Amino acid sequence: MEFTQKVLRSEKPIHELALEYEINYAGKSRADIRSEMGRRINVMRDAALKGTEQEIRTRSGLVVGNGKKLYSSLSENSLTGPIVGKGIAYAVAIAEVNAGMGVIVATPTAGSCGVVPGALISLEENLQSKNLTESFFTASGIGLIIAENATFAAAVAGCGAEIGSSAAMASASIVEYCGGSKKQALDAAAISMKSYLGLACDPVAGLVEVPCIKRNAIAVANSFASAEMALSGVESAIPFLEVVGAMHRLGKKLPSSLRETSRGGLAVTKTALKIRSRILD
């Protein structure tokens, strides 16, 4: 919990503490670490572009180019507005690229890979106020707190550990991008993660496609809503670190059927079983 304590005690912003951690961990210079983050951001941008320009399809037939469909339908009259709407489209696009065996960056997992980049890339394109590098270090710092105190593995703690973590990472990084304080970033992370406590991991046919991809989109909307609340001064009644602990404890209490085994939840509905039979039998 060394990094967690630094975040709680230091006056430095989360992105700076995360960068310092990576410098010490990797034994590389500040310039090298920032350059590597830039390279990974470019991988995420490429995935977003691919998934919105190409109709990504998978052999299962469950992925049918929804990223391109969403992006193409965006307009000034979109219900979610330009920032959230484009973020949702990017999240779906990136998650579809992952399902189609394309190159992505796990943020923090492959199954939740669309949330952080979807939200941040859209934010940058719409506001154009600053570079994204620091924002992704903020996201990684929130991720490190979760890693030190809980898990990202849905097989251990359900989908709250995956999509809940990614939403927390995204919401905190949105807050810092918009000039919010560290406390506001942590409040946003707490607010967003609370929405996913006890969420089942129940992938249809054992594939990271349904409901995983659409959960990425919903998590983007969640992250912006949580960031908006925190930036306005709304506080989380429960501190982020305690929310992380609750996510971990509750997730581990889920039956194994709801922890990535595809033996419960959506995975055993009548339609899901027909899909599984068609794909696997």
Task: Please name every model-derived segment.
Residues 1-102, 233, 240-281:
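Generic N-terminal targeting/processing segments that precede catalytic cores or assembly contacts
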Residues 78, 107-110, 154-162, 210-214, ...:
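Alpha-helix capping and helix-loop boundary segments enriched in small/acidic/polar residues
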Residues 81-98, 131-150, 195-203, 238-241, ...:
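Acidic-glycine-rich active-site phosphate/pyrophosphate-binding loop
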Residues 101-119, 161-166:
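Conserved phosphate/anionic-ligand binding catalytic regions in large, soluble enzymes, centered on
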Residues 105-108, 146-157, 200-207:
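Core alpha/beta catalytic barrel or barrel-like domain that forms the active/cofactor pocket
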Residues 112, 155-172, 194-199, 217-224:
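Active-site-proximal catalytic alpha-helix in oxidoreductases
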Residues 117-128, 174-179:
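Alpha-helical support elements that line or immediately flank enzyme active sites
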Residues 176-281:
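Functionally critical mobile loop/hinge segments
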